[in-house]
Amino acid sequence: MLGLGTLARKIFGTPNDRKVKSVRSLVARINDLEPEFQALSDEGIKQKTAEFQRRVQEGGESLDDLLPEAFANCREGARRALGLRAFDVQLMGGIFLHQGNIAEMKTGEGKTLVATFPAYLNALAGKGVHVVTVNDYLAKRDAEWMGKVYAQLGLATGVVYPFQSDEEKKAAYAADITYATNNELGFDYLRDNMKASKEEMRQRGHFFAIVDEVDSILIDEARTPLIISGPSQDRSDLYTKVDKLIPELVEEHYKLDEKTRNVTFTEEGNEFLEKRLLETGLLPEGQSLYDPESTTIVHHVNQGLRAHKLFNRDQQYIVRDDEIMLIDEFTGRMMRGRRLSDGLHQAIEAKEGVSIQPENVTLASVTFQNYFRLYEKLGGMTGTAATEAEEFMEIYGLGVVEVPTNRPVARADEHDAVYRTAREKHDGIVASIKDAHERGQPILVGTTSIDKSEALSDLLKSAGIPHNVLNARQHEQEAQIVADAGKLGAVTIATNMAGRGTDIQLGGNVEMKVMQALAADPAAHPDEVRARIEAEHAEEKERVKEAGGLFVLGTERHESRRIDNQLRGRSGRQGDPGRSAFFLSLEDDLMRIFGSDRLDKVLSTLGMKEGEAIVHPWVNKSLEKAQAKVEARNFDIRKQLLKFDDVMNDQRKAIFSQRLEIMETEDLSEIAQDMRYQVIDDLIDQHMPPRSYADQWDIEGMHRAVQDKLGLDAPLAKWAQEEGVDQDVVRERLCEASDRQMTEKAEAFGPETMRSIEKQILLQTIDAKWREHLLTLEHLRSVVGFRGYAQRDPLSEYKTEAFALFESMLNSLRQDVTQKLAQVRPLSEEEQQAMMRQFLDQQRAAAAAEAPVAPAPQPAAAAPQPTPELVGAEAGEPDPAAWGNVARNDPCPCGSGLKYKHCHGRLD
């Protein structure tokens, strides 16, 4: 008998069915327009793009109204540029992306081509579209490949990757459609908000982003903040000394919680540690671990414990070229340039005996959650999103739509096989691989870590089974290994295949084979080579199909069902046959941590023999329940982290917005004046409290403060003795005196130079104060959780204190800006010449030693500038004739620190 829910779905359809049905009329309209666009010339297609741009940008037509025509034009452009005609389901995927949804499309359904449709349509608005990929290789590959489509349509394509110059990045972001990784987009956003002028900024706004592998970026990476950091003090010696103590610990000294990935010292551990720290001199005599002075050493010891007990070589990281390289637990890739914060990376470096890099201080940070919420519209693609649909909707406002496959999935998904021990499981895996290999069926074996992939590789070597291994160590050969994975009888062991970005094609990859053949014989005719290889490939593909297609064998369940589904999804692409199965044991991490005791009792009751496996739907359901619990817990953690980060995000947006306003404003004298007046108000409130008499005022303290903050020697004692002088009179006189002082400075510097100085000082001070504030918030966040023990809500406490700290930072900012502007003064000609001589001496000494040239000393009035290039100038009077052509916005070669146009290049 059918349940009520099942019956309702059969009658009314699922919500997903209704969404798919709702766009069928649009797809039909696009199909109806196809002959019209096929009749256009190549130039006619480009002219259509120009027409669409006018209709949107000048005529005010909506993108939704333009969608059928734009998609029809894009489909024809792709057909001519790539020889690919988009299927109806690909058009559906494109429509859902344009509508701001996540399109769940199975592997091999052509997601890369799907992205071109909404990217083209939204690029017509002229605000730029970002297509986001998970790594630089895919960004470059997709930009080059799909760039042919956009070029056919008359649009420009850009690609952003690390180590480009500012000009290259600006050009890439100025293109109609820009391909980039999530990391580089986030870092460029932070870098832009550290620039000194708007002209230097690279990004031009956040209009529409299409995120490939959206679940990997917006969920798996959501807890990882992007941090731009600078070096702080070097404490590598302390890490090394602490690391020597950790191996002395025994199990009674610490408590390890694998579920939450946390480790803490027990009371016995603290006592042992205190004793050893005193013996080694790391803790001064008479001081205990619980004293406030011991905070630093306790922090180092805790990080050392985490490095040893939570981070394992070849699982969470590998050692390469005297460096610790982190490994992405979801994709198995190395994360170059990524470091753990708070001294944990240094603790791992000490553990492995590699060079310890200095700790860093945060200069700017943002999480992916908050970065991608900057976009006016967001869309995403993935093969697996349904299990996280609630999180996508709650945090990002993104609906998930499962797009039908072009052909029905023919893959057979088998129930999990569960063994008692890991040894029995491995025997079963090797036997299964051997059987499939002998039948010619290609096999992809998924493992969860490098060490497990290499252990399985050793077992296959012993069994005499040829195979390839794909993990972070072999990432350079990734494309070749994946291309070969679908060949007859191929055996490929891979760490998590999520986000690999390359389809495993039955019979191997034709394009890769053609490239290799042409590289081996450059004289061969490309068309003949392709025809021969395509014929061979078709024959091999049929043999692979007869053998059962690609067999995906998972050796362990991941905490996330989504990662397991991604592994399964590598098989059965475009209606190909395939098979998937997971071989598990009660010793696997997920089974061990999340309650294998009950299952162990069941297996014992059944009286299973050595080497036998239990295969039953009940086992699958139990595992999926355990995975769902882990996913729910991780979702709660991400939600809670987002609530905390939202507090900082509001402050970040306020600071970045203020910074942008300062960069865009030519004359900041009013802002500087408002700050000055506020500082005067604060000083009066502090030293001359309201409703107090003159004889109660702190005249001496006020005089010192006015000299320090305003640079004024005001006769406050004399004013206080005058009849009728109150706080308002003092305020008015100080404001007038400070205004006169700033007017005189502007005359001495010249108005244009003074405005430039005000801007530089404001931006430099904001950046410095924001850096300090980030550090303070980090410390607050690390301790505010303890307020829960006092029955106080940590989040409410964090919000209250973070707001108070923000106000305090703004107050400090006003004081520092006012003080710096009060102290700034023009350099005399003698001082400029002295600085010039000093710089030339340094340059000659550096040239003689073949060492880098030290930067020129900077006057107090100027921001640090790049080292000026001097051509043939001698010590003494600067000789402009010897400087060659100097750009007007470059630093003046005389060493004044001013721009050339404001100094020796002035047109007066």
From Swiss-Prot:
Residues annotated as binding Zn(2+): 892, 894, 903-904
UniProt catalytic activity: ATP + H2O + cellular proteinSide 1 = ADP + phosphate + cellular proteinSide 2
Cross-referenced NCBIfam families: PRK12904.1, secA
Swiss-Prot/TrEMBL GO biological process terms: intracellular protein transmembrane transport; protein import; protein targeting; protein transport by the Sec complex
Ranges of Low complexity composition bias in the record: 846-864
Subcellular location: Cell inner membrane; Cytoplasm
Species annotation: Cereibacter sphaeroides (strain KD131 / KCTC 12085) (Rhodobacter sphaeroides)
Keyword Metal-binding: yes
Cofactors: Zn(2+)
Annotated family: Belongs to the SecA family.
Transmembrane segments: none
Statement: the UniProt record of this protein carries the keyword Zinc: yes
Any single GO CC term annotated in Swiss-Prot or TrEMBL for this entry: cytosol
Binding-site list for ATP: 90, 108-112, 503
EC number: 7.4.2.8
Enzyme class label: translocase
Cited PANTHER family: CHLOROPLAST PROTEIN-TRANSPORTING ATPASE, SECA INNER MEMBRANE COMPONENT OF SEC PROTEIN SECRETION SYSTEM
Gene Ontology terms, MF aspect: ATP binding; metal ion binding; protein-exporting ATPase activity
Keywords for the protein's UniProt record, in alphabetical order: ATP-binding, Cell inner membrane, Cell membrane, Cytoplasm, Membrane, Metal-binding, Nucleotide-binding, Protein transport, Translocase, Translocation, Transport, Zinc
Main location: membrane
CDD domains xref list: DEXDc_SecA, SF2_C_secA
The name this protein goes by in its record: Protein translocase subunit SecA
Quaternary data: Monomer and homodimer. Part of the essential Sec protein translocation apparatus which comprises SecA, SecYEG and auxiliary proteins SecDF-YajC and YidC.
